[in-house]
Amino acid sequence: MSNSNDNIWNNTEELNELLRIRREKLNILRSMGIEPYGIDRFERTNLSSDIKNDYENFEGKVVTLAGRIMSKRSHGKASFADIQDRDGRIQIYVKYDTVGEKNYEIFKILDIGDIIGVTGEVFKSKTGEITIRVTDFKLLSKSLQILPEKWHGLKDPDLRYRQRYTDLIINPEVKEVFLKRTKIIKAIREFLDNRGFLEVETPILHTIAGGAAARPFITHHNALDIDMYLRIALELHLKRLIVGGLEKVYEMGRVFRNEGMDIRHNPEFTLLELYEAYTDYYGMMELTEQLFAYVAQKVNGITKIVYQGTEIDLTPPWKRITMVDAIKEYVGVDFNEVKTDEEAIEIAKKLNLETKEGMKKGEVIALVFDELVEQHLIQPTFVMDYPVEISPLAKRKHDNPAFTSRFEAFIYGREVANAFSELNDPIDQKERFLEQLKQREAGDEEAHMMDEDFINALEVGMPPTGGLGIGVDRLVMFMTDAYSIRDVILFPTMKPKND
């Protein structure tokens, strides 16, 4: 579709004149006795999709629809227009002889972007297009802005994210992404509910930021006169519920991390966390691959997806490999043979990786993996047995206590899930928190704080438990072939635009 406003976006003077004309039309309509915002309710009989999907049953019938004018073509005493509702566009035909002189003059004044309600008979035009022959119409809302033309005005991603309302109007494929997002979230809930999980809600305001290695947002509670934190994870409250005997719980909600932004990170994002008593990280692996396959089948009708041109097969079982073996496979270094922290640091330096003073062997292993291995994990892969130094809430492996019963799942070189056999030894947990406190005192703002109440909960007794976290936005990215996380969040965080 090409509109008369194609080239105005580079001409401020012309744009301002068109905006002035729209406001002038507002006054003209009011002088004609039309209040452009005066209708509070408009009853529709159908949506555009009803008619377009079942034309044979609607042909010749009178219907009432409402939508936004997206194009308008006048031919003397007859005009065609396309109106867009929730489900798409449909053509309308407005004729002078049918609606009368005054109404036709009003229709001629209307602009692209105005919202109208129409009543008329369904028929097909000479070109075979399904059309409404309008017998009556009402202006429901006058648009005072100029809608950008699809390929010119809204190709700037920054503008699209800032004005998502306009993006949704102009680009139907954007609306499809968010409709699919809703289906994905519904499918996740359905999958977990069917397996006996209980959905719960836990606090967003925390007195202690815990459950993840991340920098929190800080706020102040005036009545209590204390600083509080927007949650960076859901973990510690959900584990308290496992202690309380709920056994299978999950929460899907917003978490907030005061960190950088890129194509995979937004400061506020949707996180799914679930915990199940009497299972371990192997049980979480099975649940993870089943959940991804279920959602793909439910939403896309197939367990294979194409992401950025690469076919990804989500069908279980997924590949499983330890972190140390993955490094050995892709880098050629066997950290099982490395005995000291110093030796590990030297290996990292030879690999041209930047190290920090005092790094432990486990931290070096994680560094090598992050920098040199992740990008190779295209097909779904569980990377298992993470070093204890970077896994303060995961249970140690009994046969190798330097590592934990933890995995992360990777697709297309990106982490999509994180899971543990949860640490339920309160003494070990307290020791790890104390080690994290040392890291905080040394300047690591992402290290865990001490949470005495959580330690107390573990002392009451938590059964063996498997826990899983999935970034819902990243899952949606894969299911919708979205390049950036901003493409799957309706209103992503943006730097304020300077006036």
From Swiss-Prot:
Sites binding Mg(2+) 2 sit at 415
Specify where it is mainly localized: cytoplasm
UniProt-listed GO biological process terms: lysyl-tRNA aminoacylation
Q: What class of enzyme is it?
A: ligase
Annotated cofactor note = Binds 3 Mg(2+) ions per subunit.
Q: Which GO terms describe its molecular function?
A: ATP binding; catalytic activity, acting on a protein; lysine-tRNA ligase activity; magnesium ion binding; transferase activity; tRNA binding
Please, which domain of life does this record's source organism belong to?
A: Bacteria
Return the protein name. Lysine--tRNA ligase
Which gene is this protein's source?
A: lysS
